[in-house]
Amino acid sequence: MTQRSCSRRHFLAGFAGGLLLPALARAADDAAKAPVEADPAVVERVQRADAIRFPRESFQTEIVVRNYSNGVEGDARTFRVLSRGNDNTIVLTLEPATERGQALLMRGRDLWVFMPSVSQPVRLSLAQRLTGQVANGDLARANFAGDYTPALAGKETIDGTPALVLDLAAVDRGVTYARVRYWIAEADNRPLKAEFYALSGRLLKVARYEDFRELAGRVRPTRLVMEDALKQGEVSVLTYENMNVRDLPERMFTREYLRRLQ
């Protein structure tokens, strides 16, 4: 075999390898990005837990958020939440009086804040802090079934209640948390506890669903305790009041409509 033919073979082999390796890398990357098929039975349980936390119909509720530091109560805020389905929400600030008139508008996963002193709405992320341990998405979007792919991770007992432990993986980076560890009652899907994680895998906060009472036609948690996992003693307590199912027209959930409220 001549030196020229050997060189040509080496060139062709290198050229083919240069084409093949990127193609294989792309295929592996596409496989990694492919959505994981969730067990329909597990998805249904998350949907039922969502429906226990909030009505599936349009509704209105008021939420009082009290922030604590090492057991000492700090500031408190009151919000009115109007929600139409899973994708349209308005969060109005009622108290303190100095912030009255501020409003959050969520459509899908797009979120804007409206402030009386600013002429144009400002785009926000669901993960940004609203107050204390509460992120914007904790009030504006609570659709675990739509935002996360669930998987059964095991079973545990929470305060004497047999519970399923679910791992919820974010469907994309636009949701509030990258991952949620979620405990729901095995018997009736009541939400019991949740751990919220950052994209890095760091535990951000721990939440407990408490004080189940009848609200808007069924028994729901009326108290949510959120503890900072990074800074001990920092706690926010959310109390849900005056929850009512009501008709909310879609025209309410627009930037133009909220501008008229300013």
Positions of PLM-derived features:
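Short amphipathic beta-strand and strand-loop transition segments with alternating hydrophobic
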Residues: A151-T157, E210-F212
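Solvent-exposed coil/turn segments that connect beta secondary-structure elements
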Residues: R66, R84-N86, L94-P96, R109, ...
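N-terminal secretory signal peptides and thylakoid transit peptides that target proteins
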Residues: T2-G18
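N-terminal mature ectodomain segment of secretory-pathway/periplasmic proteins
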Residues: V42-S117
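Gly/Pro-enriched, hydrophobic low-complexity segments
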Residues: Q120-R123, N136, A140-N143, T161-E256
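Surface-exposed, polar helix/loop patches in the mature regions of secreted/periplasmic/lumenal proteins
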Residues: M106-G146
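Boundary at the C-terminal end of the N-terminal hydrophobic targeting segment
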Residues: A25-A27
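N-terminal low-complexity, Pro/Thr/Ser-rich intrinsically disordered segments
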Residues: K33-A41
